[in-house]
Amino acid sequence: MTKEEYDLNIEKLISWANAYYVFDNPIATDEEYDKLARLCLAYEQENPKLSHPNSPNKRVGGIVLDGFIKASHLSRMWSQEDVFNTQELEDWIKRASKVNTNLEFFCQPKFDGASLNLIYENGILKQAITRGDGTVGEDVTNNAKTIFSIPLEIEEKSLIEIRGEVVIKKADFEKINIERAKNGEQLFANPRNAAAGSLRQLDSNITAKRKLFFNVWGIGQNSLEHKKYSQIMEYIYSLGFERPQMQTLASNIEEIESLYHKFISIRNDFEMMLDGMVIKIDDIETQEELGYTVKFPRWSCAYKFPAVEKTTKLKAITLQVGRTGIITPVAEVEPTLIDGSTVSRATLHNFDEIERLDLKINDEVIIIKSGDIIPKITKVFFERRKGDEITISRPTSCPTCNSEVLDEGTMIKCQNLDCPSRVVNSIIYFASKNCMNIDGLGNKIVEQLFNEKKIYDILDIYSLKYEDLQDLEGFKEKKINNLLNAIENTKGSELHRVINALGIEHIGEVASKQICLEFGLDVINKDYDSLIALDGFGEQMANSFIEFMRVNKNLVEKLISIINPKVEIKKEVSENPFKNKTVVITGTMSKSRGEIKSMLEDLGAKVSSSVSKKTDYVIFGEDAGSKYDKAIELGVKLLTEEEMNSLF
């Protein structure tokens, strides 16, 4: 076979593979495909340097791993802000319009699958990482290479992250479950679970057989210079990625609503599961000005489909005790299939909600579920009552430790700090992904260790030894070593992660970062006045933090001595023209807006997204637009990029 013949045969193989795996429309028999693939493979083995970068032979599974290793995203994979109705959408647009009143919106289908980040360097697929906690995920590169809708090589040579959703088509999902039923295996609940499970197979042969599909929805780190998000996406599709159906630009809320309702009308006919529509501000400069909250970009939202309603029956109420002692009622209902998954429990929030609904055991009720939202009861059919309904009473004692509870109306609390449920849930929270991220220390393992009297509090995690675990059910050598290594790896974590992991009421990730940056290790000794003086730190937060430290200070001190956390040093900014000044950036400059923003913040400036009388400087480049005009109108001092640089 000559090189020219080989290239032609590879193009034919790629065409056949795409027809089968991507478009579900085979144009060659298995025998024809296998025969040609073997011929090409023989050529590749003899001429490895001449092999085609996207040869289907490079996608074949065969690698079996012991486990997945952790890998970091180059830039964070953010969550999406959810909106559920027209009013919430209007509110989101109103917030975005404060930066730019002339908005265009890039709308695309929201696929219900498993998020994946592809890292290409010099045009080669180097790594594929699951979302994980948004910062660190799992390396599934070998499995990603078996997915035919993921190019192994692209023409873009700069370092770039291309992100999307791994899904399974509904028809393929049905075939997989039929096969699993024949083999006596547990069925997948829905296509999303099947896609996520298939992507995380240790044996890439299994992944290769599942006909996974990759839908691009965005990018992470990149050096592209397009001014519109829609232009970026068109470029990404030109690199060999599939373009989703019904992706378009909208100029106003009416056009967005029209497209959204089209999605709703065809969602059941769509070949893949959808759970909404993603809306993004199209202008890149506006995206940069809007920036991010702690959880999601302000320039993007997910317009979720309406919740699916079903009728079921309330069988019982289970009481759950959280780490702060709050007792939450959970509805146990007759198992009901909703939107592809079986629901047997629903949230009730608190006992005020039970009283508002006038809910009784044995009532027939309406239960709703939408995507990831926890199912909840919205209505009781009073007219269907038969007389065997049982009134639900507010608890007077803790269901776990039997201590007397404090009933504050909306909240009912167990005040016993040694309550087993409080202790277990505090340990679970401490070890969770968004806190200390101790892989292998999930809910069931924590409960097992607590029940076996191996741990009694957070500190005991760090005293665990091999011999403590070797006789426990389900613990083998590898599992024990992995857990002990995961615990050891938390040592040297940032101080704010440790404080956040303590689960102090009203003190979340943002507040933890703020107080740790301000006070360092001395944070545990701070009084009310010191805390309340911080910007955005309210009375409730300060009182909660002080009370927690009063009760648990000894434990926290020991924990800090064991973990020896990293302390971020607050930079002391020397006097300069930008210190404590409010600055607005507009227009195109030689450096990116993000770089300039970072430089100014390092100098002690507050970079704002809008011009007002309180603005000290507006720094402008080419195509400055309305912010430049507003600065002139208000008499705000204007600086060119050169003038700004001269002040550094």
From Swiss-Prot:
PROSITE patterns: BRCT (PS50172), DNA_LIGASE_N1 (PS01055)
Domain BRCT intervals: 573-648
Positions that bind Zn(2+): C398, C401, C414, C419
GO term, biological process aspect, one: DNA replication
Residues at the catalytic site: K110
Alphabetical list of CDD domains matching this protein: BRCT_DNA_ligase_like, LIGANc
Cofactor dependency: Mg(2+); Mn(2+)
Keyword match Disulfide bond: no
Name recorded for this polypeptide: DNA ligase
Organism (species): Aliarcobacter butzleri (strain RM4018) (Arcobacter butzleri)
Lineage: Bacteria, Pseudomonadati, Campylobacterota, Epsilonproteobacteria, Campylobacterales
